[in-house]
Regions:
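Catalytic NTP-binding/metal-coordinating core of nucleotidyl cyclase/transferase enzymes
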Residues: 2-81, 85
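Intrinsically disordered, glycine/charged-rich C-terminal tails and inter-domain linkers
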Residues: 1-12, 140-141, 147-253
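Catalytic beta-strand-to-alpha-helix segment of the class III nucleotidyl cyclase homology domain
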Residues: 66-191
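Polar/charged alpha-helical tracts
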Residues: 53, 115-117, 225, 229
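Short, acidic Gly/Pro/Ser/Thr-rich loop/turn segments
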Residues: 24, 104-106, 194-196
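Juxtamembrane/interface motifs at transmembrane-helix termini
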Residues: 46, 56, 96-98, 204-206
Length: 254
């Protein structure tokens, strides 16, 4: 085998996005195939619309979707729109989203394979595994990023009008992924503190380090949070002052 790329192959950096409907099998069993097919159809149509809006390309689909974007900013913009749509339309299910940035081999399928029902494009590379593992531990209201995707976001994310200005991000932990040699730092991006909490282990992802709980940073605190912050600390300081005053009297024999 030659190391040279074939004419139908190209290697480039892309944002790989994987989504997955949480509990899809249980949903079908509970509601029946007819109702499930209607919901999944509405869901898939929305996903395709958001992929087009953010200049992405669908690679594969089943219970979830595999897609690629030219930039991480486009991928995150897609994720925010997608998650918002699921919430606002009150879908009876939620989904996971994982985003990874990597150099991938993009393979264009031959015409006869496409005519037979095959995919037009395939992605090859370990990056697809990392994206899948990242997605697998995502909470139902979360958007998770790999380390490389997070760095791309921090570098270029401010340029995107589709990423909310109030978006917050946090390192949620270090995970060891099955089939991936090096541990992966995973980040969450969201609008509220609850969306930035560390996800638990998954079948193919084990958490090996990181904070147990993510707390809001000073610049992200809301007004009522600042009030509570000052009351709590003011009360603690007052307690120390009172203790300082009465401590000598407690041990004064007179």
């Amino acid at each position: 085998m030659s190391n040279e790329l074939s004419k139908n192959m190209v290697e480039q950096y892309i944002a790989i996005v994987l989504t997955d409907i949480i509990g899809s099998t249980r949903f079908v069993q509970k509601n029946g195939s007819h109702i499930a097919a209607q919901w999944f159809g509405i869901h898939d149509k929305a996903v395709m619309n958001f992929i087009a809006r953010h200049n992405g390309q669908l690679i594969d689909a089943s219970d979830g979707h595999l897609m690629m974007f030219a930039t991480v900013s486009d991928a995150i913009g897609f994720a925010f729109d997608y998650k918002k749509y699921i919430r606002k339309r009150k879908f009876p299910f939620r989904s996971r989203v994982g985003i990874h940035w990597d150099k991938m081999l993009i393979v264009k399928s031959e015409a006869h394979m496409v005519r037979a029902g095959g995919k037009r494009i395939n992605l090859e590379g370990i990056g697809k595994n990392i994206a899948a593992r990242t997605m697998s531990i995502c909470g139902e209201e979360q958007i998770l990023l790999s380390k490389s995707a997070y760095f791309q976001y921090k570098k270029y994310g401010h340029r995107s009008r589709f990423i909310p200005n109030k978006a917050q991000s946090a390192l949620v932990g270090l995970y060891r992924f099955k089939g991936v040699a090096e541990p992966e730092a995973i980040y969450a991006i969201g609008l509220i503190e609850a969306q930035l909490q560390p996800p638990p282990d998954g079948e193919k992802a084990k958490r090996i380090g990181g904070a147990k709980k993510i707390r809001s940073r000073a610049r992200d605190r809301k007004f009522w949070e600042w009030i509570w912050w000052f009351i709590w600390r003011g009360g603690f300081v007052s307690f120390l002052m009172i203790l300082y005053i009465i401590w000598p009297a407690m041990f004064d024999p007179n």
